[in-house]
Amino acid sequence: MEETIKDPPTSAVLLDHCHFSQVIFNSVEKFYIPGGDVTCHYTFTQHFIPRRKDWIGIFRVGWKTTREYYTFMWVTLPIDLNNKSAKQQEVQFKAYYLPKDDEYYQFCYVDEDGVVRGASIPFQFRPENEEDILVVTTQGEVEEIEQHNKELCKENQELKDSCISLQKQNSDMQAELQKKQEELETLQSINKKLELKVKEQKDYWETELLQLKEQNQKMSSENEKMGIRVDQLQAQLSTQEKEMEKLVQGDQDKTEQLEQLKKENDHLFLSLTEQRKDQKKLEQTVEQMKQNETTAMKKQQELMDENFDLSKRLSENEIICNALQRQKERLEGENDLLKRENSRLLSYMGLDFNSLPYQVPTSDEGGARQNPGLAYGNPYSGIQESSSPSPLSIKKCPICKADDICDHTLEQQQMQPLCFNCPICDKIFPATEKQIFEDHVFCHSL
């Protein structure tokens, strides 16, 4: 097997993983005569795109990986892949690099990833034989050849079965190898992380060691200072022991004073108890006074509420009284108006109001005794009784067609319901709405 200066890209990809149909080899002979150059013709399929480091190698039939090439040639990239002629390419192998034996070989197209994209039919490198020679064989030789052929077929089948078994084992081994490679990559990654962690830990320990050394030096210096400090504290302790003796003596004196103070405290406690009892009685008295005051305030509030209600009612009565007074004045004005109207009518009839025997009563009782339907009586009743006028002098009433002119205006006013005028806003209410009138007047006082 011969190699060039730069080896092509290969891989350990099995035959099962290759795509032999993407590059098609054309015009491949059954055998090539040794000593001459060999031209390899091939065609790219529609969806295949060649790359710069693709190559075509000559492999012995039965090869397993692309590393088992005998010789190879780099592929020439076409300028325009869309052109039909660019799909058909060729490469020439020099006679010097071709095999010298008569084994079966084949062309294989391998891409830059080391994957086989096409393979040709097998061929040989041998001289041309005389194919026109007539060979005469006996029947026994034919049977022997047939028997030998059967044995070869059987052996071929066994070899195929063995090849399939080996391919399966190889596939399992490839899967196991892939798994081991993944585990190796994982372990390498973990190893790198651990190495990095160990380095970081080492740096941390070195830093911590330096810090501990510095702390040790500081502690040694502080230890010397503490020795001096201990001597000073011992001297202070002796002084404090003497002071403690004085304090113990003073404590005894304080204890005696405390006993005396406890006795005085007991006496004061008894006095305080008596004072608390007196204070409790005073609190009860104050509470009783507060209750009495609360009761008095409630009564005062009730009286104030009652006084307010009475004042409210008084205001309402005053308002109603004023309203009635206004109504009375209005009625008196209407009465005067009616009197003037009667005088005018009497003058129209040729009578004198002062010469009438009956005057208009000024009270409601007089009017009621004369005629319950009239408020002021009939001013013409006396005239009818005193004199009997002639039929020619009697005038007809234009309203009721009576023999005398009747005062229907007064009757119409008497038949109308009594009205109430608001003394504040002069709003008029019917006599049937007396309660509404009172509420309206009361609202003005709020």
From Swiss-Prot:
Residues 371-381 are annotated as: Interaction with LGALS8. The gene is CALCOCO2. The modification Phosphoserine is found at residue 445. Residues 395-446 are annotated as: Interaction with MYO6. Dimer. Part of a complex consisting of CALCOCO2, TAX1BP1 and MYO6. Interacts with MYO6. Interacts with GEMIN4. Interacts with ATG8 family members MAP1LC3A, MAP1LC3B, GABARAP, GABARAPL1 and GABARAPL2. Interacts with ATG8 family member MAP1LC3C. Interacts with LGALS8. Interacts with TOM1; the interaction is indirect and is mediated by MYO6, which acts as a bridge between TOM1 and CALCOCO2. Interacts with AZI2. Residues 362-390 are annotated as: Disordered. It is a peripheral membrane protein. Changing residue 378 to A: Prevents interaction with LGALS8. Changing residue 400 to A: Does not affect interaction with MYO6. It comes from Homo sapiens. One of its GO terms (cellular component) is cytoplasm. Expressed in all tissues tested with highest expression in skeletal muscle and lowest in brain. This is Calcium-binding and coiled-coil domain-containing protein 2. Xenophagy-specific receptor required for autophagy-mediated intracellular bacteria degradation. Acts as an effector protein of galectin-sensed membrane damage that restricts the proliferation of infecting pathogens such as Salmonella typhimurium upon entry into the cytosol by targeting LGALS8-associated bacteria for autophagy. Initially orchestrates bacteria targeting to autophagosomes and subsequently ensures pathogen degradation by regulating pathogen-containing autophagosome maturation. Disulfide bonds: none annotated. A motif (CLIR) lies at residues 133-136. Keywords: Autophagy, Coiled coil, Cytoplasm, Cytoplasmic vesicle, Cytoskeleton, Host-virus interaction, Membrane, Metal-binding, Phosphoprotein, Zinc, Zinc-finger. Belongs to the CALCOCO family.
